[in-house]
Amino acid sequence: MEQDNSPRKIQFTVPLLEPHLDPEAAEQIRRRRPTPATLVLTSDQSSPEIDEDRIPNPHLKSTLAMSPRQRKKMTRITPTMKELQMMVEHHLGQQQQGEEPEGAAESTGTQESRPPGIPDTEVESRLGTSGTAKKTAECIPKTHERGSKEPSTKEPSTHIPPLDSKGANFV
C-alpha cells in the first residue's frame, strides 16, 4: 500500500525513554527535542553552514545561532520597569498633545502618586477612554456616617449600619 520512500512522508524514530523516568520528566525531554522542520533547516547537507541568503527573516538568523535554551529565554523577555515606565510616559505624552492642560495634569498626577510596588497596568486601568485619570473618590461609593440625620439625595446605598448591642438598628 504505502511506499517507504515517499517524499511526502517524514519518517523518524524516537528512542524509548529510560523506564526509571517519571512521565513529567519524559514530557520535558520530549518538549526540548527539536521539531522535524528545525532539523531540516539546521542540518542542511548542501553546506556546513546555514546559507543566510535563504533565510529572509534577520531575527531568525540570529536565533538559529543560539542554543535552544537561549532561544526559549529570548522569546519570553518582558520589559523592565524602566522600559515600562518609558512606554507609559510616551503613551501619556501622545495623549496629552491633543488635550487641555488640566486633563494632562490629572493623568501625570496619577502616575506620580503610584506606589513602586503597583505595576503600570493598574495605572492604565484607572485611565478613562479619553486618557484622563478618574478620581478614586468617584469610583468608590460613599457611605453615610452613622450619626447623620440628613436625608440622602443620592441613590440608595447597599450599606447596612451595624446593630447596637441590643440587636436593634440605631440610626
From Swiss-Prot:
<feature type="modified residue" description="Phosphoserine">
    <location>
        <position position="46"/>
    </location>
</feature>
<protein>
    <recommendedName>
        <fullName>Protein phosphatase 1 regulatory subunit 1A</fullName>
    </recommendedName>
</protein>
<feature type="region of interest" description="Interaction with PPP1R15A">
    <location>
        <begin position="143"/>
        <end position="171"/>
    </location>
</feature>
<keyword id="KW-0321">Glycogen metabolism</keyword>
<feature type="modified residue" description="Phosphothreonine; by PKA">
    <location>
        <position position="35"/>
    </location>
</feature>
<dbReference type="Pfam" id="PF05395">
    <property type="entry name" value="DARPP-32"/>
</dbReference>
<keyword id="KW-0597">Phosphoprotein</keyword>
<keyword id="KW-0650">Protein phosphatase inhibitor</keyword>
<comment type="function">
    <text>Inhibitor of protein-phosphatase 1. This protein may be important in hormonal control of glycogen metabolism. Does not inhibit type-2 phosphatases.</text>
</comment>
<feature type="modified residue" description="Phosphoserine">
    <location>
        <position position="43"/>
    </location>
</feature>
<feature type="compositionally biased region" description="Basic and acidic residues">
    <location>
        <begin position="19"/>
        <end position="29"/>
    </location>
</feature>
<feature type="region of interest" description="Essential for activity">
    <location>
        <begin position="9"/>
        <end position="12"/>
    </location>
</feature>
<dbReference type="InterPro" id="IPR008466">
    <property type="entry name" value="PPP1R1A/B/C"/>
</dbReference>
<feature type="modified residue" description="Phosphoserine">
    <location>
        <position position="67"/>
    </location>
</feature>
<keyword id="KW-0007">Acetylation</keyword>
<feature type="region of interest" description="Essential for activity">
    <location>
        <begin position="42"/>
        <end position="54"/>
    </location>
</feature>
<comment type="subunit">
    <text>Interacts with PPP1R15A.</text>
</comment>
<keyword id="KW-0119">Carbohydrate metabolism</keyword>
<dbReference type="GO" id="GO:0004864">
    <property type="term" value="F:protein phosphatase inhibitor activity"/>
</dbReference>
<feature type="region of interest" description="Disordered">
    <location>
        <begin position="1"/>
        <end position="171"/>
    </location>
</feature>
<feature type="modified residue" description="Phosphoserine">
    <location>
        <position position="47"/>
    </location>
</feature>
<dbReference type="GO" id="GO:0035556">
    <property type="term" value="P:intracellular signal transduction"/>
</dbReference>
<dbReference type="GO" id="GO:0005977">
    <property type="term" value="P:glycogen metabolic process"/>
</dbReference>
<dbReference type="GO" id="GO:0005737">
    <property type="term" value="C:cytoplasm"/>
</dbReference>
<feature type="modified residue" description="N-acetylmethionine">
    <location>
        <position position="1"/>
    </location>
</feature>
<comment type="similarity">
    <text>Belongs to the protein phosphatase inhibitor 1 family.</text>
</comment>
<feature type="compositionally biased region" description="Basic and acidic residues">
    <location>
        <begin position="135"/>
        <end position="157"/>
    </location>
</feature>
